[in-house]
Structures are given as structure tokens and as C-alpha cells.
Amino acid sequence: ESEIATVLPRMLRRGKVAYLFNKYSRSQQIGCVLFCHHNDQKAEPTIGDTINSWIEDNIGKDAQERTRMLQDTRGISPLFLIATKFNIDLECTKNDKQDDTSTLDKHWNRFDTVLPEIVGPSKWLDQWTVSAGVAKPFQSIYPLRDFYWSAKNGLFDGYSDGETKSPEKGHFHPGFPGYMDCLRRSFLSNQFVRDHFASPEKTWEEVATLNNDGSKPIIRDLGEISGVLDEARRKRCLERLIALKKA
């Protein structure tokens, strides 16, 4: 009973969010979903099923349907997976050693473990679209870091969250002088990254370099898809109605 005061409001809030999401999804009023998750997120048990259902209803039940849909959205997925708090993934920890760079591989646990656990048994993460009979993995993942916490935790220096903003500066790690270069190589060699990022090098430049927090590609792709999404959704809806009529 002592936990009711904190647990009950959280349950009601989550129930309200789930209700509203399902309501607007069923009425086709959600064009894009930006699913934000941080590095060690303990997702609700049903979140994977919720995302999968939305994908099936709004993008396609299988790789072939999704391929047709994305042909009308300039190749941009209406589902954006936003890897928030990416500054935590990038931070140098006490376990990172210059003489054993293999420890850096643990920085990508979000991609290797957390995200696949959220998605669950659904196959769309690895079989998003198809080209020439070959399945292509989902590649609309956007790492996003926080400028303030990047400075606060020693990833970069110089940024101020006050009224006067200042540009970032490189941070020197005394115990690991080449830390960021080694971390970059670890990121680029990670198998999940190689599979699920169209250009890992570009992704790194857009989120893990000075004054780049990862927001630009999100804004860019939202701008690209916004002008064509309504027509693509109308076309998909019409195709589904025709299929139902023939059934």
C-alpha cells in the first residue's frame, strides 16, 4: 500500500498514453512515430507489440509491403528510432583502457542487446525491405546526445547551458589520450551498426563530433518525408480497400 501513491499515477499515465496512441492509430491520425529510447531502457513488456502493430497497419505487414510504401516516401521510414542520451554511450568509463580497446565494444550494448529486446521476436528489424530478393535491415536509427550532459560528464568541454551559449571543445582524457578515435573505430566495426546504419561514418560525424548532437539528420528526414507522407498513406489505404473488395 505504501507504493500506491507513486505506482498508481504512473500506471494511469501509461494507460492514458496507450489509449490515446491506439485511438489515433486506429483512426489513421498518426503519420510518423518517433520512438525514443535511452541506453538501458527497461521498456514496457507490450511496447514491442505496439510498435509492430503500428508498422503492420501503417507501413506494411512484410518486407514487400514496406518496400512499396517506402517507394512513395523517398525511402524514408515513417518510423524513427531515436537513440536518446547517446552521450552516455560515448562517455569514457573507468573500465576503458588504452591497452585493451576491446572493452569499448560494451559501449554499444544499446544496439546489441537493449533494442533487439524491445523489438522482440518481430522480424522487421532485420527484414525491413527487400531488394532483388534480398532482405534489407531497418536503417532509420538516429543517435541523439545532449550538449549539456556531454560537457557535464567530460565527453566534450566548453558548452554552457546558461543564457550565453558557447561552442563545444575537444576533451582530453589523461588516461586514454586517443579515446575518441578508438571509440569511433569500435563504433564503425560493430556489426549492428554496419547492418543498421546506411552510412556509419556519416552517423558518427553527425552525432559524435564537435557541435553536432544528432538532431540535424532527424530534422532533415522529417522535412523530406513530410511533403509526401499524406499521399503515400492515401495510396496505401486505397490499395488495402481494393484488396479487401477482391477478397
Describe each PLM feature range.
Residues 1-2:
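Switch I (G2) and immediately adjacent beta-strands of P-loop GTPase domains
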Residues 6-33, 39-246:
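Conserved GTPase G-domain substructure that encodes guanine base recognition and part of the catalytic core
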